[in-house]
A protein has these predicted regions:
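Active-site and donor-binding regions of nucleotide-sugar-utilizing enzymes
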Residues: 5-21, 35-140
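Short internal beta-strands
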Residues: 29-35, 126-128, 211-215
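Catalytic donor nucleotide-activated moiety binding site of glycosyltransferases and closely related
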Residues: 36, 45-58, 180, 202-232
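Donor nucleotide-activated moiety binding/catalytic core segment of transferases
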Residues: 71-76, 217-255
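A donor-sugar binding/catalytic signature common to diverse glycosyltransferases
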Residues: 85-96, 106-108, 241-278
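A nucleotide-sugar donor-handling region in carbohydrate enzymes
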Residues: 126-193
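Catalytic binding pocket for nucleotide-activated donors in carbohydrate/polymer assembly enzymes
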Residues: 261-307
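C-terminal amphipathic helix plus adjacent low-complexity
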Residues: 305-333
């Protein structure tokens, strides 16, 4: 079969890389990618060839909508013939697949930001067990038979079989550090009047070595004047960052969940008022600390200790997901 993967954001690369590695043994793989954040460098890191289509359009809702329409048009013109599509969120893959009358598979763990057309046009939906799928059935008319659940988190998929790089610390100028990744202030799910707390975090952690991973070029300015802050000049392995850092502090959820599954203390200073179900579960288990108060965060980090790694369970989750994917592909062979 010809399987088309569309990759539009950095976490998508990590999630799809092991799946592509498995499926390419028996299938032809087509990959399209959007130029955003570290998406393209990571595809190169994993050795995945891609067709470049589109770029990020910033915070403007109008530009996002027009950009989506233009990219869908470009995909219709540029994507070779395929038998089934795989996408995260499905905003781009479902219209193209529907137009070409091909099935689509949508992966997501986001149960607070719903993409109407993805659920109306999608064929199969693959969710983690901790997902409010009843709402999808009620609000969008998705059938229960279209929904496939795996008993884990999406981060389990690419942490399966992970082995720490023994030379990773050669990339850094210090032996012990915490990591800070800013909020994604340009994302739709972040309130427009949100201000970053990263400068405040830098102040309270002024005596701690910090690996700073800015999302956008302009965020580098936050670190000016601090000798304890290091910004890498190349893309680092996110998994190794999460493993070796003393604590992971992030303005979103993915890095926090990755770190938590590796046993690393994690802090989310996500600015939204509503959290994903997967993040609520992480908080309930004590794996992720959620706060936007710099002093509270400082006290948590000061006393934080490593937890047990979940890697053995992650391997089981990955195998479970592969069975789900193979069962879907068998329908269309």
């Amino acid at each position: 079969m010809n399987i088309w993967f569309d990759i539009t954001n950095t976490p998508h690369v990590h999630f799809f890389a092991p799946i592509i590695g498995h499926l390419k043994q028996e299938h032809e793989i087509i990959v399209t990618a959007r130029d955003f954040s570290e998406t393209l460098p990571l595809l190169k890191f994993y050795g995945i060839d891609y067709i470049l289509t589109g770029s990020h359009k910033g915070k403007s809702r109008f530009k996002k909508i027009t950009g989506l329409a233009v990219r869908i048009r470009d995909l219709l013109n540029r994507v070779p013939e395929f038998d089934i599509s795989f996408g995260i969120g499905g905003q781009n893959t479902t219209p193209v697949s529907a137009w070409r009358r091909k099935p689509s598979v949508i992966f997501t763990d986001n149960d607070i930001s719903y993409k109407w057309h993805s659920y109306k046009l999608g064929s199969h939906f693959v969710f983690p067990f901790y997902f409010d799928y009843e709402r999808v059935i009620k609000n969008f008319g998705v059938k229960r038979s279209q929904i496939h659940l795996y008993n884990g988190f999406k981060e389990d998929i690419y942490l399966a079989n992970y082995t720490p790089d023994p030379n990773f610390m050669d990339n850094l100028p210090f032996k012990e550090f915490i990591t800070i990744r800013p909020e994604n202030l340009k994302a739709n799910y972040v309130p427009e009047d949100t201000e970053t707390i990263v400068p405040e975090l830098f102040k309270v952690f002024k005596d701690v070595n910090i690996l700073f991973l800015p999302r956008y070029e302009e965020e580098r300015a936050y670190a000016e004047g601090y000798k304890n802050i290091f910004i890498p000049d190349k893309v680092l392995s996110g998994k190794d960052v999460c493993y070796y850092t003393k604590v992971m502090l992030t303005g979103a959820g993915t890095f926090a969940r990755e770190a938590a599954l590796l046993g690393t203390p994690a802090v989310s200073f996500f600015p939204g008022k509503t959290f994903l179900t997967v993040d609520k579960i992480m908080q309930e288990r004590g794996w992720v600390f959620i706060s936007r108060n710099p002093e509270e965060i400082f006290q948590y980090v000061k006393n934080a200790k490593r937890n047990d790694s979940q890697l053995e369970r992650s391997n089981q989750v990955f195998q479970e997901l592969l069975k789900i994917i193979n069962s879907i592909l068998d329908i269309y062979k």
